[in-house]
Amino acid sequence: MRLIPLLCIPGVITSCQVREHEQPNIVFIMTDDHGYQAISAYGGTLNSTPALDRIAGEGVIFRNSFVCNSISAPSRAALLTGKHSHANGHTDNRQRFDSSQVTFPRLLREAGYQTAVIGKWHLQSEPTGFDYWNILPGQGSYYNPDFIEMGRRYRQEGYATTLITDMAIDWIRDRDKSKPFCILVHHKAPHRNWMPDTIDFDLFDDPDFPVPGNFFDDYEGRKGAELQKMSIFKDMRMASDLKITGTDGDSITQSEKDYISYLEKRLTPQQYRAWQNEYESLSRSYNAHPLTGDSLAIFKLNRYLSDYLRTIQSVDRNTGRLLDFIDSAGLRDNTIIVYTSDQGFYLGEHGWFDKRFMYEESFRTPLMMRLPQGFEAKGDIGEMVQNIDLAPTFLELAGVSPPDDMQGMSLVPLLRGPAVKKWRDALYYHYYEYPGEHDTRPHYGVRTDRYKLIHFYGETDHWELYDLESDQHEMKNLI
């Protein structure tokens, strides 16, 4: 007589279905402040990102991917919970994440996944829902970073992006192979102050990047955009941001003192020598021919982008290493690879660096996926998606029903292909942090395919409306 497995009897059919359709592994790679303009798969011409392009080329690329609050900690909380900031309670960078909340890693772990997070966490609380965690405290350091591994703090010599990738590969190699896994590989790069690996110092030498058409924006009719302190010309620091010292002649500013002290304490002697060789010559060259006005603004843009893109080069190189390992380990067919950033970033548009605003460059974020076998979607996906969608997506892929209070929409229907008949027609955004760094005023808004409506509130009561078809750079407020 043939025995029927207990798990397949009525009442527990869900477990049987999950066994029949193997749960995919999840590798979730996220960077900090990586603008889509600096990924060649998105049509960017500033740099080449072959490994990131490989994810898009072998899978899908979302052309309209957005965040719900363009600042680090709230964005991470939204990703974990699948909820907007007002619903998960984490509205700005100054708060401590309520780790008692339901998150997708916790639910995956309960469903039998082995879970890990390695790299940047930035939520002021210890990770929960993970079998293993090894995180950077706070913002972390590019060079010889401190890590907190399951409560134990230590310092590791090396470059953060490479170290995080090494740790991720080691964890995947040594995991419990009887279980599906989910690992969050979260990089510090390319966050300010853009400290490249010494092996990338030869890239983008003597740069002459294209200047955005609205680099010298006067913000006419856009009070919300005018009231900020994120100007490359006015607010970017010569020493710690651009690595140019000695601009005050024989005197040394406090900013320069702090910058030099940090380097001396953090870098090894070999790293420090390489750093000095690179940036002292740049400082001498600048100080021999100091600039003012528009020429100085463009110099700062080039200097900023050079180091920003160098840090991305390390991300791309190490992402390629991780992809190669996954393929060589025989995991490709049943692993989804996701690449995104916690938000977008300004690369000179409107004269800015940083993020925070609902304008396109910081509202948008890259999102690319290489899919497991059985998914038909390929190439471009044009529907509007948001970072709160990733949590329910991961859960549905694992055969877990998302909680009813998750506000995101699972992307699985888009991944199965062909295009879905019905999808959302608008997105909600809300930035809260004020007063705060860069003085960006709080605002909320709604975006459709064609229009964007923004309300700046508090000290400033100001409305803006943009027609994104005729004004893609958001220069003409229709109100």
Which residue ranges define each predicted feature?
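Formylglycine-dependent sulfatase
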Residues: 2, 16-457, 462-463, 472-479
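Sec-dependent signal peptide recognition
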Residues: 1-7
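Residues forming the ATP-binding cleft of Hanks-type serine/threonine protein kinase domains
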Residues: 469
